[in-house]
Design a protein with these regions (language model features):
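Intrinsically disordered, low-complexity boundary segments flanking structured domains
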Residues: 16-19, 38-45, 106, 169-170, ...
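Generic enzyme active-site microenvironment
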Residues: 54, 154, 229, 266
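Substrate-binding/active-site clefts of carbohydrate-active enzymes
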Residues: 49, 58-74, 78-224, 232-259, ...
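Internal hydrophobic scaffold segments of catalytic domains
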Residues: 1-10, 91-93, 160-161, 273, ...
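Polar, glycine-rich mid-to-C-terminal structural blocks
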Residues: 246, 251-255, 262-286
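The feature marks proteins involved in alpha-glucan
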Residues: 1-52, 64-68
């Protein structure tokens, strides 16, 4: 799966809404070195849940008042002493998956990032330049410095839907590869939606859950991330026809994955389809 994306300067979301040729304005994948995180020099802090104090932040807004000429991730390094002084043990970064800033109505900007177009790549706007390799190194450095300060890094991850919208939305990634595999689609050919964003990922189908597991492993082993908070996590427990599953295969895979054993897992226990599992979440480790 692509670890890097390029083409943002020429990207136009509207050109992916129909069947016209859009090679000149679509995003391109970049092959990157899958370098593993250096846990020997920057080991995980591994704070117990009892002593964990989480500081949730958006990387762009948190660093907005610092030097405008530096990237968000570089500016964040200057704030680590402040976070350490607060006494927190972990930061929870609001979505940093690559997302579409133009996925917003009436010419507005999508600021928060809850509209991913790739589950393996950090968002381009938070870096110094467009080099995918340099971007990966920059985020890895952030995690290294947090570990040095005894601070864990938790990511707010969005696997329940994507930026491709409903059946009339743009074909950016998953939709163009195999929309019938990745999304729940009704007999009327319309996308079924319990995310409130136009589509819902069919997370318990074999190839889809494998992709999600590989994404989690990527952030854990290649970037050194210490935990994940699943946006609308209970939506990931739905099976065919959006039926809730008692033992969702995805959660079983996460629970049994050796590379995720020491990872902190947090989840929202609800979705926009009315499913609510507070205190009864179908995963032993979440």
């Amino acid at each position: 799966c692509s670890r890097g994306i390029t083409g943002w300067k020429s990207y136009k979301r509207e050109n992916a809404l129909n069947t016209q040729e859009n090679t000149h304005s679509c995003l391109k994948s970049v092959v990157c070195d899958r370098k593993l995180f250096n846990f020997k020099d920057y080991p995980r802090p591994k704070h117990s849940w009892e002593e964990t104090i989480i500081y949730e932040l958006h990387i762009k807004s948190f660093t907005e008042l610092i030097d405008k000429n530096e990237s968000c991730f570089k500016k964040f390094l200057k704030k680590i002493p402040y976070l350490k002084e607060l006494g927190i043990t972990a930061i929870e970064l609001l979505p940093i998956f690559c997302f579409d800033p133009t996925d917003a109505p009436n010419g507005l900007e999508n600021f928060w990032g809850y509209s991913p177009i790739n589950w393996f790549t950090p968002h381009f706007e938070y870096f110094s330049d467009e080099s995918a390799e340099k971007n990966r190194e920059e985020f890895r450095r952030l995690v290294e410095e947090c570990h040095k300060a005894d601070i864990e890094v938790i990511l707010d991850v969005v696997y329940n839907h994507t930026s491709e919208g409903d059946s009339q939305g743009p074909a950016i990634s998953w939709k163009g590869i195999d929309e019938n595999l990745y999304y729940f689609i009704g007999e009327d050919k319309n996308y079924q939606d319990v995310s409130g964003c136009g589509n819902t990922i069919a997370a318990n189908r074999g190839l889809v859950r494998k992709l999600i597991i590989e994404s989690l492993k990527c952030w854990s082993s290649e970037f050194g991330v210490d935990g994940f908070r699943f946006d609308l996590g209970i939506a990931l427990s739905r099976g065919e026809n959006l039926s809730p599953l008692e033992n969702p295969p995805l959660f079983e895979d996460i629970d049994c994955e050796p590379e995720l054993i020491d990872i902190k897992l947090i989840s929202e226990p609800w979705d926009c389809g009315g499913l609510y599992k507070l205190g009864n979440f179908p995963s032993k480790n979440t």
